[in-house]
C-alpha cells in the first residue's frame, strides 16, 4: 500500500482515482499529476514502482497544498473572518449559512436539529 501525503492510497484502484483519497486532490488535480509525472492513467497503484510513487509524492509536495496544511489554512481563513467581525465571520460564529441562503425554513444541516418550542397542546 503506497503512502502519499500521509494517506494510505488504495492499491487496487487506478492511479487518478486513488489520488482523490487525499484531501485537497480532486479528479482534475489527479489527472494533472498523472500527466505531469508521465504515468499512464489506466495503471493501478500496485503496478507502480517505488520511483514512480516517489515522483508523485515529490510533485504533490512541490505544487499542491494538501491534507493537514490545507485544513489548517481553511481554519485560519475562517478564524480571520471571525476576528475581523465581518458578516461572513458572524455567520460562521453563529453557525448559520454563510453564502446568503434562506434560514426561515431549511438550513437544518448548518443550524442543527430543530429545537421544539413549547406551545399549547391539543
From Swiss-Prot:
Keyword Transmembrane in record = no
Instruction: Tell me one GO biological process term.
Output: translation
**Could you confirm whether the keyword Ribonucleoprotein appears in this record?**
yes
One cellular component term from this protein's GO annotations in UniProt: cytosol
Q: What InterPro entries does the database record attribute to this sequence?
A: Rbsml_uS13_C, Ribosomal_uS13, Ribosomal_uS13-like_H2TH, Ribosomal_uS13_bac-type, Ribosomal_uS13_CS
Please name the GO terms that the record assigns under molecular function.
Answer: rRNA binding; structural constituent of ribosome; tRNA binding
Keywords per UniProt: Ribonucleoprotein, Ribosomal protein, RNA-binding, rRNA-binding, tRNA-binding
PROSITE patterns in the record? RIBOSOMAL_S13_1, RIBOSOMAL_S13_2
Checking SUPFAM superfamilies in the record gives: S13-like H2TH domain
Which Pfam families does the record associate with it? Answer: Ribosomal_S13
Chain spans, region Disordered: 92-122
Gene3D superfamilies per UniProt: 1.10.8.50, 30s ribosomal protein s13, domain 2 (4.10.910.10)
- Kindly give the NCBIfam families that the UniProt entry links to this protein: uS13_bact
Name the PANTHER family on file: 30S RIBOSOMAL PROTEIN S13/40S RIBOSOMAL PROTEIN S18, SMALL RIBOSOMAL SUBUNIT PROTEIN US13M
Q: What family does this belong to?
A: Belongs to the universal ribosomal protein uS13 family.
Subunit: Part of the 30S ribosomal subunit. Forms a loose heterodimer with protein S19. Forms two bridges to the 50S subunit in the 70S ribosome.
* General function of this protein: Located at the top of the head of the 30S subunit, it contacts several helices of the 16S rRNA. In the 70S ribosome it contacts the 23S rRNA (bridge B1a) and protein L5 of the 50S subunit (bridge B1b), connecting the 2 subunits; these bridges are implicated in subunit movement. Contacts the tRNAs in the A and P-sites.
From the Swiss-Prot or TrEMBL record, give the protein name.
Small ribosomal subunit protein uS13
